[in-house]
Amino acid sequence: MCWPLLYPLMLGFSISPAECQTPSIYDDVESTREGQEASLRPTVELNESKSPDKPNPRGFPGKPCANNSDTLELPASSEALLLGWVPTRLVPAIYGLVVVVGLPANGLALWVLATRVPRLPSTILLMNLAVADLLLALVLPPRLVYHLRGQRWPFGEAACRVATAALYGHMYGSVLLLAAVSLDRYLALVHSLRARALRGQRLTTILCLVAWLSAATLVLPLTFHRQTFLLAGSDRMLCHDALPLAEQTSHWRPAFICLAVLGCFVPLLAMVLCYGATLRALAANGQRYSHAVRLTALVLFSAVAAFTPSNVLLVLHYSNPSPEAWGNLYGAYVPSLALSTLNSCVDPFIYYYVSHEFREKVRAMLCRQLKASSSSQASREAGSRGTAICSSTLL
């Protein structure tokens, strides 16, 4: 993995002073006239026609105000994209849907998997996937509030770093867990004889630990640098959407490209290979497994459709496009990132509720809960009537 080599860059240390050193506010004073003129010229400038051979910033490129480093100035075009109806209406609507649907769906699925289903290797993987989707629904409300309030973050710097890392951590953790599920199903269906020796709780536990630790390692750099800045000329405290140009150009470009490649493209490639071999094995049996073929194709399509667009836009954002495309690419990336979270609502229905046995267990469990609550309510009503009779007798 290339992340250990990138940590010095992400912490702000430079490997090549000529390329990565963060410029000071003013150049050193030289003895020549050119040096004297250069010493009075700020090196941190906001120029929409910036040379395309320089790395692009993460998010919208912001220019720190001369008298306040906590405030960023944005070009008018970037500010219009940042405050438009897509990030302030569409994105919070998507996040709200994820919370409303994903929280009960994944919570119920996790409950059934943990209490009513035999602890098989596939069950452990699906439980971890349900936990990841459930955690997303729990950490999304702050970002929902942020977008609904017109890009105003009220929870402080630490909460912004945690919320940003959690959002990206869910994305890449989910992709890694989905890749582990595809490997498990490949072993079970294509190598069914060997699977008895390979598929065990030990291998499953290792796969889950690798997925969680890899996701945490990939998003850890997001907690190293400041993420909240005040938008110049307004009361909007931005969270991760606009960052200083000079502080981001040296390390965020390799960091986020590595994040997209290792956290998304490589696991998705593994899923395509595993599910491709699984589909061939199922299709060889004709109509006998037609339902399994359709379901496997749906699982693969949903994962690719959910995670590919946002990560492709992320890579394009760092591939030195024309200066006019910087804001447009990030403006498209924000809703595509929100759309990727919809996968947490889809997972329960294509992995759990599609199974007739699973639905029966859910139905039986809900019926027992309803009967228990009805009997408890009836006993309380009977007790209250008895208390009323005793009270009237005493009177």
Curated annotation (Swiss-Prot):
Q: Where in the cell is it found?
A: Cell membrane
Those parts of the protein on the Cytoplasmic side are: 115-119, 183-203, 276-295, 355-395
Transmembrane feature ranges: 94-114, 120-140, 162-182, 204-224, 255-275, 296-316, 331-354
Name the GO terms of the biological process aspect.
G protein-coupled receptor signaling pathway; platelet activation; platelet aggregation; positive regulation of release of sequestered calcium ion into cytosol
Q: For this UniProt record, give its keywords in alphabetical order, as a comma-separated list.
A: Blood coagulation, Cell membrane, Disulfide bond, G-protein coupled receptor, Glycoprotein, Hemostasis, Membrane, Receptor, Signal, Transducer, Transmembrane, Transmembrane helix
**Entry annotated with the keyword Flavoprotein:** no
The topology of this chain with respect to the membrane is:
Multi-pass membrane protein
What are the annotated disulfide bridges?
C160-C239
At the top level, the lineage of the source is Eukaryota
Q: Name one GO molecular function term.
A: protease binding
Biased composition, class Basic and acidic residues, residue ranges = 47-56
Answer yes or no on keyword Glycoprotein.
yes
Extracellular compartment residues: 59-93, 141-161, 225-254, 317-330
Name the glycosylated positions. Answer: N67
Where is the site labelled Cleavage?
A: R58, G59
Protein family according to the UniProt entry: Belongs to the G-protein coupled receptor 1 family.
Q: What does this protein do?
A: Receptor for activated thrombin or trypsin coupled to G proteins that stimulate phosphoinositide hydrolysis. May play a role in platelets activation.
Protein's name in the database: Proteinase-activated receptor 4
Q: What is the lineage of its organism?
A: Eukaryota, Metazoa, Chordata, Craniata, Vertebrata
